[in-house]
């Protein structure tokens, strides 16, 4: 056996052929298996003529023969290094150290021994066999080995061997760390499974040594799959360990919450709706459920919401009232709207009050629609029916003795008949539809009511116009004579035919013509007279406006605000006369423009 090994080291051509054969075998793993096996058979016939006899002689060695061979070896650095490589599991690092020392002597052995030891380590051959038999065994196993996994390819290079060793060591450390972390969360059965999965690759390599050389293909896949299995199991354990760890931390469907989040744990504030939109957890789980829970329980708690809104509105009113009282005590007058809005706090109260009233109105309407009864409907109808009653009574008092007021009676009678035909409905939508239907009648009735009171008030206006010193009575003059003067001719005829009060107008006009021209008979004046009145009226307006402006400026200096209606009492006469002059000026301008148009036509 020793002579065979020495022969393998001395024969350079044989060693180089063996090295090239192993290199070709390792590189040609990705090539076609049939071509490689054919080439190997031809090379074996040429280079190893006596391999079969030697394999038969040294097929089954014993442990004692192995020890005898180790004792009879001569003390040689190269041979001892080679035998150490045959025995060890990691020959590449030892060979690298020896090659650094004896680079010139053992350059050839550096190629031969790793390839042989690699083939021997992969095939599981014993260390006492001859190098020729081990080379042949390596060739046979490579030839018959199936391509199961590309990761199990035999790499004879030293650099990649050390990298693979480091990678295996790091994987073993990671597996040990994962098993330590998962031991707190996994059961004893899972722990046993992980320990077996981690420790299985090492015994697999030791137990894969074949007893017979006739069937070398069986142990090789087992040993060859061991690194791949170790890598796969490490990846599986890493993914499974992390997933199980996360599963135990989150506790499945019931995640563990922080103690500071005890308010939200297992409560209805937690949003578990799968149909909800994907949003950040801060807004989805805590902010959104508050509004959703409020909306969900709004049907039963609507009266409470209405009461809360009512209390809020009352508190805002109370605050505003206190501000008004305090303001009045300090400045001796009630605050105006501008005074309230100038204060930002009061402005906020007023805005909140408007919003609260609007929300309260919407809530009441919604509640009435849900309950099927609208308390606002009949109230509105009553409010619409009650105001016309005194007006109709007033009309009957003023226009009661009229025998021929058929147009007004028909228009006033249509509205009550329509109200009787459309009783107050329970649904709020129905009342809106009815109001839209009756709206033209309301508009017509409103226009008639605005026209009817004017004829009865005309005589009193004419009497007051003669005495211009009466300011309180003259305050009604600016608004009343304008519509009368602007009425069409047909309306004047209707009033003269239907109202007996109009019979007094000619006598009053005759009495009014005697002193001077007044508001009632300006339309009878000529163009020069109208122009003179226009100049005089404009001069009076300027004079009064100057006096009133001085009063307002003085008041503003004293109080810092413009005078209100109650502040104008000292200058009530001037204000009344100023309004009267403005109305007279408008009338004169209209009359002059009418006469100019008539002349042009």
From Swiss-Prot:
Residues 200-217, 282-294 have a biased composition (Low complexity). Residues 98-111, 327-342, 415-446 have a biased composition (Basic and acidic residues). The keyword Phosphoprotein applies. This is Protein FAM13C. The modification Phosphoserine is found at residues 130, 258, 405-406. The gene is Fam13c. It comes from Mus musculus. Residues 462-471 have a biased composition (Acidic residues). Keywords: Phosphoprotein.
């Amino acid at each position: 056996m020793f002579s065979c090994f020495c022969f393998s080291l001395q024969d350079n051509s044989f060693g180089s052929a063996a090295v090239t054969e192993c290199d070709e075998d390792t590189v040609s793993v990705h090539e076609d298996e049939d071509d490689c096996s054919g080439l190997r058979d031809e090379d074996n016939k040429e280079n190893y003529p006596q391999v079969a006899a030697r394999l038969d002689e040294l097929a089954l060695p014993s442990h004692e023969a192995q020890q005898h061979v180790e004792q009879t070896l001569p003390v040689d650095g190269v041979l001892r290094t080679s035998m150490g490589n045959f025995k060890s599991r990691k020959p590449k690092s030892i060979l690298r150290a020896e090659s650094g020392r004896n680079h010139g002597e053992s350059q050839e052995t550096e190629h031969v021994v790793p390839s042989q030891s690699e083939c021997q380590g992969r095939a599981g051959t014993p260390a006492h066999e001859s190098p020729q038999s081990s080379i042949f065994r390596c060739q046979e196993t490579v030839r018959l080995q199936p391509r199961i996994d590309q990761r199990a390819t035999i790499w004879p290079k030293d650099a990649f061997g050390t990298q693979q060793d480091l990678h295996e060591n790091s994987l073993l450390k990671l597996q040990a760390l994962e098993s330590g972390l998962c031991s707190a969360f996994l059961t004893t059965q899972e722990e046993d499974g992980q320990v077996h999965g981690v420790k299985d690759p090492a015994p697999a390599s030791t137990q894969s040594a074949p007893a017979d050389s006739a069937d070398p293909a069986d142990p090789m896949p087992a040993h060859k799959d061991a690194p791949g299995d170790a890598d796969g199991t490490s990846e599986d354990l890493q993914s499974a360990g992390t997933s199980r760890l996360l599963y135990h931390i989150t506790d499945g469907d019931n995640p563990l919450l922080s103690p500071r989040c005890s308010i939200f744990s297992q409560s209805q504030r937690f949003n578990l709706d799968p149909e909800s939109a994907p949003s950040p957890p801060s807004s989805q789980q805590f902010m959104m459920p508050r509004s959703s829970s409020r909306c969900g329980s709004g049907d039963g708690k609507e009266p409470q919401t209405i009461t809360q809104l009512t209390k809020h509105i009352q508190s805002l009113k109370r605050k505003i009232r206190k501000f008004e009282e305090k303001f009045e005590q300090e400045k001796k007058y009630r605050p105006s709207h501008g005074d309230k809005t100038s204060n930002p706090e009061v402005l906020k109260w007023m805005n909140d009050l408007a919003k609260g009233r609007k929300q309260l109105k919407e809530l009441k309407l919604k509640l009435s629609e849900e309950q099927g009864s609208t308390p606002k409907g009949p109230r509105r109808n009553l409010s619409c029916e009650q105001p016309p009653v005194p007006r109709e009574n007033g009309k009957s008092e003023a226009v009661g003795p009229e025998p021929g007021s058929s147009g007004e009676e028909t228009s006033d009678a249509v509205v009550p008949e329509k109200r009787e035909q459309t009783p107050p409905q329970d649904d709020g939508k129905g009342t809106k539809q009815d109001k839209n239907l009756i709206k033209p009648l309301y508009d017509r009735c409103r226009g008639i009511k605005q026209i009817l009171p004017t004829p009865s008030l005309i005589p009193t206006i004419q009497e007051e116009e003669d005495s211009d010193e009466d300011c309180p009575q003259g305050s009604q003059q600016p608004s009343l004579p304008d519509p009368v003067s602007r009425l069409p001719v047909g309306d004047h005829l209707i009033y003269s035919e239907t109202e007996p009060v109009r019979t007094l107008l000619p006598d009053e006009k005759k009495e009014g013509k005697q002193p001077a021209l007044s508001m009632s008979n300006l339309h009878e004046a000529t163009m020069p007279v109208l122009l003179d009145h226009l100049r005089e009226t404009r001069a009076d307006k300027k004079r009064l406006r100057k006096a009133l402006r001085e009063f307002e400026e003085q008041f503003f200096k004293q109080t810092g605000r413009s005078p209100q209606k109650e502040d104008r009492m000292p200058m009530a006469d001037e204000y009344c006369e100023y309004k009267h002059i403005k109305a007279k000026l408008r009338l004169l301008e209209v009359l002059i423009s009418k006469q100019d148009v008539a002349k042009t036509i």
